[in-house]
Amino acid sequence: MNVTLLIPARYGSSRFPGKPLAPINGKPMIQHVYERASLAKGLTAIYVATDDDRIKDAVEGFGGKVVMTSPDAASGTDRIEDAITQLGLKDDDLVVNLQGDQPLIDPISIEQIISLFERHPGEFGMATLGFEITEKCELDDPKHVKMVFDNEFNALYFSRARIPFGRDTNDYPVYKHLGVYAYTRSFISTFAKLPLGRLEDLEKLEQLRALEHGYKIKVAISAFDSPEVDTPEDIRVCESRLAVD
């Protein structure tokens, strides 16, 4: 099975302009993401998907591969679709979508999501990762997307609110969504053509589009958190963790 990992990266950000190139312990953040992803077993190729020459130059500067995408991409999925079209991937090829602001991603988590397709061939077209929340401050923070799934680890819903809600107790596990996806190439094309979902638009969570249109999203529960860098303040947390990793 051919497995291509794509790291979409935008330079523009209202909260953190130039985020992919922000230095963390002497390296741009995108380099940390790329190098950690490259430690995962089972990958055929890794590319950064970007529309910015500054990111392109930085990635090629450390020996990484880049695919340039249209600056008019309306969403992350559109950027992925653009990239895989240029790369000429086949319908049954697997694509892993790893966000460029996850410098603490554990390679084992990437291997875990790939293994779902190896163990359940043809049962679903899309998969993602979850992690049991251990920090109470994340439970009601809309920045941390929560998720619920059935007994077969098929996603039921994603929300910025705390789900599920315990009427009589607070002593139960709550899982957050880690922004890593894997899909077959054919499913990405199908997904990109689906109309915007009502719940997707309400929560501003693109993955809800698949659920609203009746498609399965298989979930793997990771033993490793992968916090995203959203603000310059998050850089300090990453530097501390990477120093002891």
UniProtKB/Swiss-Prot annotation:
EC number: 2.7.7.90
Pathway(s): Bacterial outer membrane biogenesis; lipopolysaccharide biosynthesis
Function field: Activates KDO8N (a required 8-carbon sugar) for incorporation into bacterial lipopolysaccharide in the Shewanella genus.
Similarity comment: family membership: Belongs to the KdsB family.
Keyword Protein biosynthesis applies: no
Matches recorded under InterPro entries: Cytidylyl_trans (IPR003329), KdsB (IPR004528), Nucleotide-diphossugar_trans (IPR029044)
Record's keyword terms, sorted: Cytoplasm, Lipopolysaccharide biosynthesis, Nucleotidyltransferase, Transferase
Record GO biological process: lipopolysaccharide biosynthetic process
One annotated GO molecular function: 3-deoxy-manno-octulosonate cytidylyltransferase activity
UniProt source species: Shewanella sediminis (strain HAW-EB3)
Protein localization: Cytoplasm
Pfam family, one: CTP_transf_3
Catalytic activity: 8-amino-3,8-dideoxy-alpha-D-manno-octulosonate + CTP = CMP-8-amino-3,8-dideoxy-alpha-D-manno-oct-2-ulosonate + diphosphate
Name this protein carries in UniProt: 8-amino-3,8-dideoxy-manno-octulosonate cytidylyltransferase
Gene3D superfamilies: Spore Coat Polysaccharide Biosynthesis Protein SpsA, Chain A (3.90.550.10)
GO cellular component, one term: cytosol
Enzyme class (EC, first level): transferase
